[in-house]
Amino acid sequence: MKHPQNNLLIVKSCLSLVLALSAAAAILTSCSGAGSSAANEVAGDTLTAESDLLTLVDCGSYVVADIKNPWDSTRLLQRYVLVPDSAGNPEGLPEGTVVRTPLRNSLVYSGVHAGAIRDLGAIDAVRGVADAGYFTVAEVKAGLKSGAVMDVGSSMSPDIERVTVLAPDAILASPYQNSSYGLIERLGIPIIECADYMESTPLGRAEWIKLLGELYGCRHEADSIYKEVSAEYSRLATRAASASSHPKVITERLTNGVWFVPGGRSYMSSIITDAGGVNPWADTPDAGSIQLDFASVFDKAHDADIWLIRNYGPELTLSELKSSYDLNSRIKAFENGDVYVADTSTSTLFDDFPFHPEKLLREYILLFLGPDYAGTDKTQYYQRIEK
């Protein structure tokens, strides 16, 4: 595999020209694919069912991928027209950002997506990454060490020269409200806005593996993975729903005077409910987290049976939890020793749950209802806090 770093000096002298020449093309691309109102319907077979934000339609010689704006459901965030190299140049393509597939040279901003691409068997097509320190995929780490995978720096301000040298077929990024991609947008490289993290249900998010499957020419593999995930998730949720008791569950803790709790339409609320738990804020309309002070949380959830905390090392103890805020010790789960922590510095929790929510669901069922419902007595991510 070539080492693109060797060409950095060559590109410096012509980068300004590249940006100038590509600006017009980038503008045309963005106008045709992004920020429009509700998209015109296209005829074909719909490939998605659970996702609220992603719609894939197979139109025969190409696939249309519509991504709804998570912050304004009346508008389209992006429309991509995925055209296989084997299809040549089909006539009558709908408006949208054209992406030739399969991707063979991609720049990926998130380790979560790299993990899913690995599962599809296409990890060799990941030739560049941003925020390299957060990637745990072994093949990517080895590539970074050997130089086969380029580190382009921070996803918030990637090294434009390195990106130009890499010349990826596409960039996979996570969009944020009212944000832009800076100079990267002027290179004319398709930016695939992976808004999967904004989905409100676990299976809705997991279904985004189908988009990756289309991008990397792995539809069969993506369909197979999603089918297995969906079946296992549904089986576990059905078993949990049959439980006679449902514990009240709180998540995270007070940090800098703010406690983030899951809104009623959030991903976390969905998976807590599916695992047989009760989210105290399940009746709220919020699709994300709600910011509260300690008094508000305590008033509604002081009698919580289970307390789940994600913590990036070092190991957290009950005494440390109490010393960080004394009234933590008056929460029922604390008093009964039912506080569980996932150390995200060592576990693969963040890498696993987006595309394999059945793993997290099984763990929650074990913690909420016990091994008879979970089918296992071993945890993978969470451990009970010691004194």
PLM feature spans:
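Bacterial Sec-exported substrate-binding components of ABC uptake systems
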Residues: 31-114, 221-250, 335, 348, ...
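Extracytoplasmic ligand-binding site segments that recognize negatively charged/polar headgroups
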Residues: 104, 112-113, 129-139, 179, ...
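A short, structured surface patch at a secondary-structure boundary
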Residues: 66, 71-164, 170-173
